[in-house]
Structures are given as C-alpha cells and as structure tokens.
Amino acid sequence: MKFEKYIDHTLLKPESTRTQIDQIIDEAKAYNFKSVCVNPTHVKYAAERLADSEVLVCTVIGFPLGASTTATKAFETEDAIQNGADEIDMVINIGALKDGRFDDVQQDIEAVVKAAKGHTVKVIIETVLLDHDEIVKASELTKAAGADFVKTSTGFAGGGATAEDVKLMKDTVGADVEVKASGGVRNLEDFNKMVEAGATRIGASAGVQIMQGLEADSDY
C-alpha cells in the first residue's frame, strides 16, 4: 500500500498566493502525492509545474456552496479540464437534496461527469449538513450519476470527515465507487481512522505531517 497515493495535497483558501501554491507543488513532488488540489484559478499554473511529474492536478467545482447552476458547474468543469485539471471535485446542490429534488441532484452530478469527459469526478456531499438518511441518499445519487468518488466535505461548512460517515458512505456505494475523506484530517491517527473506515483518498492540507507520521511509525 502506497500511503502517499492516498493523499490529495490541498490548498483551497481564498487568500492562497502563488508562493503558497509553489510550496504545496514542491511538497507533492517530494512525497509523490496523488494530486494537488487547488482552486480553478491556479489549475493552469499547477499543471505546467507538474507536467514532468506523476502528481495529478485536482480542482473544485461549484465550490464551496454547491449552489451554482448546473450549467455553470458544467462550464467550470470544461474550463478546468482545458486548463490541465486531471480530477474534478464538485459540490452537490445541497438544498435540492434537502428538498427531496433528487432528480435535480443527480442531473447536476451527471452534467459534471459528462463535462469531465472521462476524468475522475469526486462528489462532495457536505456530510456535516446532512442527517443519516441524507448521507445515504446523496451517496446513492453519486453512484447512479456515474461519478468515481463520493467525498465528505468542503472544509468550509464548520465540520469535516468522521470515520462513521466514511463507513456509511462506503457501505452505501459498495465496490463500484470510492470514498474520499476531507476536512479535519490532520495527522496519522486521523488518516488511519479514515482508511480503516473505507476511504481510499484523503484530502488534506496536512499531507506532509501525515507522511512524516507514517515515516516515523514502526509499522510503515
């Protein structure tokens, strides 16, 4: 198991500077993380800097509220792919889910999957805002829409991933869809809890700290 390939090394703060983007790119190269996850404005630059590495470029769509129109999310996705994004992390229409407008939620995801043209799509359901049944339903809709991952959180809604939610999501989607845990995964202990619960991708700004913990761990 290559632990570094679980990590999307993430910097999504609105005030992120080019210097900070350079830092996470350098760290991702040094540790050979799966990807760097950056806001769309940084995608082209990140893709150019990572062209000679295995590290992928991940970006976010309809982020962080999920309240953009479906057409806007589709355009954002097309633009990101054109600029060099390899993976797309989109936010669902959370209000539509709570309304019970499940067709709208699924069609929103499907539009992004179509616009991504075969690139990996991860669907952020914002678990902290959902109850048990809503987490199950959002996970089911993600699977039905043909996305690759269901993801816990944006990190912007006041809460992050829990092992309980990750397990519920994994139990719901089964083997066909993977689970990404993000938000509040800060160290080796958090990382292990998420992986044991079924996550195969971890979104974290603390990728280096996690890896240093792994390197210091006698079981690694």
Curated annotation (Swiss-Prot):
Primary location class: cytoplasm
EC number(s) reported in the record: 4.1.2.4
Keyword Lyase appears in the UniProt entry: yes
Pathway membership: Carbohydrate degradation; 2-deoxy-D-ribose 1-phosphate degradation; D-glyceraldehyde 3-phosphate and acetaldehyde from 2-deoxy-alpha-D-ribose 1-phosphate: step 2/2
Any one of the GO BP annotations: deoxyribonucleotide catabolic process
Keywords tagged on the record: Cytoplasm, Lyase, Schiff base
EC primary class: lyase
GO MF entries: deoxyribose-phosphate aldolase activity
Reactions mediated catalytically: 2-deoxy-D-ribose 5-phosphate = D-glyceraldehyde 3-phosphate + acetaldehyde
Active-site residue numbers: 89 (proton donor/acceptor), 151 (schiff-base intermediate with acetaldehyde), 180 (proton donor/acceptor)
Subcellular location(s) per record: Cytoplasm
The UniProt record lists the keyword RNA-binding: no
GO CC aspect terms: cytoplasm
Family: Belongs to the DeoC/FbaB aldolase family. DeoC type 1 subfamily.
Main function: Catalyzes a reversible aldol reaction between acetaldehyde and D-glyceraldehyde 3-phosphate to generate 2-deoxy-D-ribose 5-phosphate.
Protein name as annotated: Deoxyribose-phosphate aldolase 1
Gene: deoC1
